[in-house]
Swiss-Prot record:
One of its GO terms (biological process) is malonyl-CoA biosynthetic process. Belongs to the AccD/PCCB family. It comes from Actinobacillus pleuropneumoniae serotype 5b (strain L20). Keywords: ATP-binding, Cytoplasm, Fatty acid biosynthesis, Fatty acid metabolism, Lipid biosynthesis, Lipid metabolism, Metal-binding, Nucleotide-binding, Transferase, Zinc, Zinc-finger. Its cofactor is Zn(2+). One of its GO terms (molecular function) is acetyl-CoA carboxylase activity. It holds the Pfam family Carboxyl_trans. A zinc finger (C4-type) spans 30-52. Component of the acetyl coenzyme A carboxylase (ACC) complex. Biotin carboxylase (BC) catalyzes the carboxylation of biotin on its carrier protein (BCCP) and then the CO(2) group is transferred by the transcarboxylase to acetyl-CoA to form malonyl-CoA. This is Acetyl-coenzyme A carboxylase carboxyl transferase subunit beta.
Amino acid sequence: MSWIERILGRTSSSSSSSKSKVPEGVWTKCTSCEQVLYSEELKRNMHVCPKCNHHMRFDARTRLLSLLDQDSAQEIAAELEPQDVLKFKDLKKYKDRLTAAQKQTGEKDSFITMYGTLHNMPVVVASFNFEFMGGSMGSVVGAKFVRAAERALADNIPFICFSASGGARMQEALFSLMQMAKTSAILAKMREKGIPFISILTDPTLGGVSASLAMLGDINIAEPKALIGFAGPRVIEQTVREKLPEGFQRAEFLLEHGAIDMIVQRKDMRDTLARLCAKMTNKPTPFKTAELIVEEA
């Protein structure tokens, strides 16, 4: 081997070894613009692409903890865990699907509920976790939603819920469908008592969740370009045999047609929710807005 070959060989091997040392998960690709992004930067930006502003799916627990004031979160009904009472089996046993989802996400089910403060205002918050079986709604989701709503009723404080779900959990059959009525009933009780319920629809919000609790907010908010509807656009096109309008079932389309009240960027969500909660409970805005600063000047 010549001295040139020895040098080139050494350089090539050291280059390949350095490449192999790059750990997994350091880089990720935007699902919209396909730009390669540094994962830590994406986390700091709350999983919103800094290049195209695409709002990616967001872990439920991280979402709630970033919404609430630091160290104020107390989980509600954390002990509840789904059971395979029907011994359901499709391509896999339901209990095996649950075990796999729990291992993947570190959560017991697809729904997390918490009590805490938002800009020092007490609130109850909840979020679906789409990574857990598509954020599907089963018996535990219904039970946790009711427990959270009951806490809001008992303390006379707002209830905020983030939806990200494919709908009812088919593995629980009628038990799953019953949760649509169960969650709607407790929200009717909240409305009677004048307790605010704010619903935030994120990508995607579909099926039985969109047909029940997700669209029953006193104020319905969506994240930009969130897919919202009952059946997905492909299913509708195959059923009606017609091409759907561009952007059909996206948040902007729904806002234009009066189905939701507003679209809010993820970075603005915390302050927007705080202002709405203060307004709906007849409390002063918990922080000074630009408008207030101008008025005082």
